[in-house]
Amino acid sequence: MTNGNNNNLEFAELKIRGKLFKLPILKASIGKDVIDISRVSAEADYFTYDPGFMSTASCQSTITYIDGDKGILWYRGYDIKDLAEKSDFLEVAYLMIYGELPSSDQYCNFTKKVAHHSLVNERLHYLFQTFCSSSHPMAIMLAAVGSLSAFYPDLLNFNETDYELTAIRMIAKIPTIAAMSYKYSIGQPFIYPDNSLDFTENFLHMMFATPCTKYKVNPIIKNALNKIFILHADHEQNASTSTVRIAGSSGANPFACISTGIASLWGPAHGGANEAVINMLKEIGSSENIPKYVAKAKDKNDPFRLMGFGHRVYKSYDPRAAVLKETCKEVLNELGQLDNNPLLQIAIELEALALKDEYFIERKLYPNVDFYSGIIYKAMGIPSQMFTVLFAIARTVGWMAQWKEMHEDPEQKISRPRQLYTGYVHREYKCIVERK
C-alpha cells in the first residue's frame, strides 16, 4: 500500500503481466476499507472473480454496520441491543428511512401515516381467491405484493418526491398482506386493520382475531414480536437486500423490487432457516440424543447439519441471537412453558454443548438469529409456514431504506455483474440430418 497525492487518497498496487495499476483505496468511516477496482476491466482488460460476492462491496451505504468478528450490529450508528431494548419497530423504521431518530412530533406523524396506509384495495381479495387453500403464505404474499403496482400506476414512473410515500405505503401494507395470506391459508375471513392499535398489536390482531372473537394482545408477546421485528429489520447487503437493489437499479417500480426481495428471502438458506431449526430440534427429540446429533454434525460424510449455527458474516456470537435467547425465556415464562418446553430445553443444552466443543470453537460456529426465533414464534401460536412471512414484514423496512438510498446515490448504475466464461469456443452449426 502506498500513499497517493490525489486528494490524499491511498492506493493499492496491482501488477498484471508487468503493468502496474494504482487502485484507489476508499475509506470506510469504520470497518474495512475498500479497493476500488471499477477501472480494472477498462484499463487492464481483465474482470475480477469473486463467487458469492464474498469480498466485493457493491455499493456505499450509511444504513447498517456489521463487525462479524466482534459481534457488532448497528443501525445508523445505534447498537442493535439498545434499539431492541429501548425502541419500537416504527421508531426504528423512521430511523432507517430518514437517518435519524424522530422527535415526538415526527414519530406521531409517521405512525399516523403508516396507520392511514394499512388498508389494501378491496379488489386484492379476488387475487387471494385464485390460490388453492394449500398455498404457502409466502407464495400468496409474493404475488400480492407484486400486484400492488397495478393499484398504484403512478409509481410505475416514480421520482424523488415519491420515495417517502412509497416507503410508508410498503411498511404499512406488508403486515396486512401477511395476515391476509395467513387467514386465507387456514380458511378464515380477513380481518381489517385497527388504527387504534400500534403496529405490532395491529398485526397480532389481524392474525388471530375473527369476526366473532376479539384478540387480546398480551404485552409480553407484543414486546417480544417488537424485538423480533427490530432485530430483523436490516442486515447490510445480504441476498434479499442485494436482490432488491439489483432489481431497483433497472428502475423497476418499488413494489416489484420488494417482491423480488421476498422471493429471495423465501430460500431455505436465507429466511427459511428458523423453520429448519424447529424441524431439527424435533428430529433430535430429547436431550439424551444431543451428543449423537453433534457427532453427526461433525461427520463430513453425514448429511445432517446443525441448523441455527454459524453465519456468513459473524465469527462470534450473533448479537441478535443473544437478545432472542432472553426474549425466548421471557415469552415461555409468561406462557408457563419455561420449564416444560422440550424444544427450548434441547436448544439450550445443544448450545451449551456446542460452545464447549473444539470443533465448533475452531470453526467459529455460534448460534445465529434463527436459533431461538422459531421457538418464540411457535410459543406465540404462529405456524412454521408463517415464520418467513414475519421475517419479510421486518425486512421490508431495510429493503425500502436500501432502495431509497440506492436511488439517491449519484454513483448508482444499473447492476451488471460479469462472468468467467468456461463454455465452448465457436462451433459450426450443422443441420439436424448431419448430426450424430
Swiss-Prot record:
Underlying gene: gltA
UniProt-recorded name of the protein: Citrate synthase
Regulation of its function: Allosterically inhibited by NADH.
Catalytic activity: oxaloacetate + acetyl-CoA + H2O = citrate + CoA + H(+)
Top-level taxonomic group: Bacteria
SUPFAM superfamilies linked to this entry: Citrate synthase
Enzyme class: transferase
E.C. designation(s): 2.3.3.16
Source species of the chain: Rickettsia prowazekii (strain Madrid E)
Further remark: Citrate synthase is found in nearly all cells capable of oxidative metabolism.
A molecular function (GO) term: citrate (Si)-synthase activity
Keyword Transferase listed: yes
GO biological process terms held by the UniProt record: tricarboxylic acid cycle
Family that this chain belongs to: Belongs to the citrate synthase family.
CDD domains noted in UniProt: EcCS_like
Oligomeric form and interacting partners: Homohexamer.
Taxonomic lineage: Bacteria, Pseudomonadati, Pseudomonadota, Alphaproteobacteria, Rickettsiales
InterPro entries: Citrate_synth-like_lrg_a-sub, Citrate_synth-like_sm_a-sub, Citrate_synthase, Citrate_synthase_AS, Citrate_synthase_bac-typ, Citrate_synthase_sf, Citrate_synthase_typ-I
Keyword field: Allosteric enzyme, Transferase, Tricarboxylic acid cycle
NCBIfam families, per database record: cit_synth_I, PRK05614.1
GO cellular component: cytoplasm
UniProt KW Transmembrane helix keyword: no
Active site: H311, D370
Pathway info: Carbohydrate metabolism; tricarboxylic acid cycle; isocitrate from oxaloacetate: step 1/2
SS bond list: none
